[in-house]
Swiss-Prot record:
Key words, A-Z: Mitochondrion, Ribonucleoprotein, Ribosomal protein, Transit peptide
GO molecular function ontology, one term from the record: structural constituent of ribosome
Any GO CC annotation of this UniProt entry: mitochondrial small ribosomal subunit
Pfam families: Ribosomal_S9
Compartment annotation: Mitochondrion
Predominant location category: mitochondrion
Similarity section: Belongs to the universal ribosomal protein uS9 family.
Entry superkingdom: Eukaryota
Lineage: Eukaryota, Fungi, Dikarya, Ascomycota, Saccharomycotina
Chain positions covered by the region annotation Disordered: 269-288
Protein name: Small ribosomal subunit protein uS9m
């Protein structure tokens, strides 16, 4: 009888020991899985729009860090809202479509954008005494870049001989023009204008930019052109002369733009299609 009792107690202890081993193995496995688990870098990874929420949390943290409560004011900061707006004008923020490129794309909703703009305005209205480089750098990311700042076109200057150089294009023709103050000579590929262009229309188109700014007979034009036909070359020279005039006087740009000689004409002859006589003309239909 005592032998049976001892056997039963031994079996129970073995089972308990095996259960403890299983629990320990399971615990170690979970610890290893927790170590190997991929943790997202952003805290907003599991939100509906992580990119937008990350920017919102960044702006809110800056407001909490630097903005004073409404009950507190710095000494010497008793100014009205109008004066504050004059001292710290509100910039033009990026549009909804531009913000969607960096703020979640199709996940971005108009209410998200409104909340984003409200936070930017609050951060921009912080007392100037509290504004630092951290706030300025954050706000500069979302200010709309003007056309002048985005293009950053370098202003051309005259060369050592007092000439302005410009390149114009039209259809398959390309022209390079050297413009210098003089008595009104025009040479094209080393030949006189009347000798190179036989059509009156082509000669008039070359002189048109000078006529627009009342400068006929005040500049010498030396042009080299290649490619295309006579009309294409003439309009390419016209385009180059207009660009060269801006080097002498950039204030002429509105007049030349209104005349339509600053912007390049990108129109080309439409190609012929298979089964058609020309670009769009169909063969004559015959019943038989």
């Amino acid at each position: 009888m005592w032998m049976r009792v001892n056997r039963m107690l031994g079996n129970v202890s073995v089972r308990q020991f095996s259960n403890v081993r299983l629990v320990a193995q399971e615990y170690s496995m979970r610890v290893q899985q927790a170590r190997n688990r991929i943790v997202p870098k952003s805290l907003t990874f599991y939100s509906a729009n992580p990119l937008h929420e990350e920017k919102i949390s960044r702006l809110e943290s800056l407001l909490k860090k630097y903005a004073l409560p409404s009950s507190q004011k710095l000494p010497g900061a008793d100014i009205s809202a109008e004066e504050n707006l004059k001292q710290n004008p509100r910039p033009s923020w990026i549009s909804f479509s531009d913000y969607a490129l960096i703020g979640g794309g199709t996940r971005l909703k108009p209410r998200h954008y409104e909340h984003f703009i409200q936070l930017l305005n609050k951060l921009n209205n912080i007392d100037p005494q509290l504004v630092n480089t951290e706030i300025k750098n954050e706000l500069s990311k979302y200010i709309k870049k003007s056309s002048i700042q985005s293009q950053k076109t370098q202003q051309k200057e005259l060369d050592e001989f007092g000439r302005s150089v410009a390149i114009g294009k039209r259809k398959a023709a390309t022209a390079k023009v050297y413009l210098v103050r003089g008595e009104g000579k025009i040479l094209v590929n080393g030949r006189q204008l009347n000798d190179y262009f036989l059509k009156m229309k082509d000669r008039e188109s070359i002189a048109y930019p000078l006529q627009v700014v009342d400068s006929l007979g005040k500049y010498n034009v030396f042009a080299t052109c290649r490619g295309g036909g006579p009309t294409g070359q003439a309009e390419a020279i016209m385009h180059a002369i207009a660009k060269a005039l801006l080097v002498f006087n950039p204030l002429l740009k509105p007049r030349l733009r209104k005349a339509g000689v600053i912007t390049r004409d990108y129109r080309h002859v439409e190609r012929k299609k298979p089964g058609k006589k020309k670009a769009r003309k169909m063969p004559t239909w015959v019943k038989r």
